[in-house]
């Protein structure tokens, strides 16, 4: 995970069971997980 919460590519996955949104940020909920 990057310093701004980025995920995917070189940043890798998210901690704590969070999802990576299609925009490349970690979070939870449908807007992060449903893509």
Swiss-Prot record:
<keyword id="KW-0611">Plant defense</keyword>
<dbReference type="InterPro" id="IPR036861">
    <property type="entry name" value="Endochitinase-like_sf"/>
</dbReference>
<keyword id="KW-0929">Antimicrobial</keyword>
<dbReference type="GO" id="GO:0050832">
    <property type="term" value="P:defense response to fungus"/>
</dbReference>
<feature type="disulfide bond">
    <location>
        <begin position="14"/>
        <end position="26"/>
    </location>
</feature>
<feature type="domain" description="Chitin-binding type-1">
    <location>
        <begin position="4"/>
        <end position="35"/>
    </location>
</feature>
<comment type="function">
    <text>Has antifungal activity against A.niger (IC(50)=5.4 uM), B.sorokiniana (IC(50)=2.0 uM), B.cinerea (IC(50)=1.6 uM), F.solani (IC(50)=3.7 uM) and A.alternata (IC(50)=5.0 uM). Binds chitin in vitro. Has no antibacterial activity at concentrations up to 10 uM.</text>
</comment>
<protein>
    <recommendedName>
        <fullName>Antimicrobial peptide 3</fullName>
    </recommendedName>
</protein>
<feature type="disulfide bond">
    <location>
        <begin position="7"/>
        <end position="20"/>
    </location>
</feature>
<keyword id="KW-0147">Chitin-binding</keyword>
<keyword id="KW-1015">Disulfide bond</keyword>
<feature type="disulfide bond">
    <location>
        <begin position="19"/>
        <end position="33"/>
    </location>
</feature>
<dbReference type="GO" id="GO:0031640">
    <property type="term" value="P:killing of cells of another organism"/>
</dbReference>
<dbReference type="InterPro" id="IPR018371">
    <property type="entry name" value="Chitin-binding_1_CS"/>
</dbReference>
<keyword id="KW-0295">Fungicide</keyword>
<dbReference type="GO" id="GO:0008061">
    <property type="term" value="F:chitin binding"/>
</dbReference>
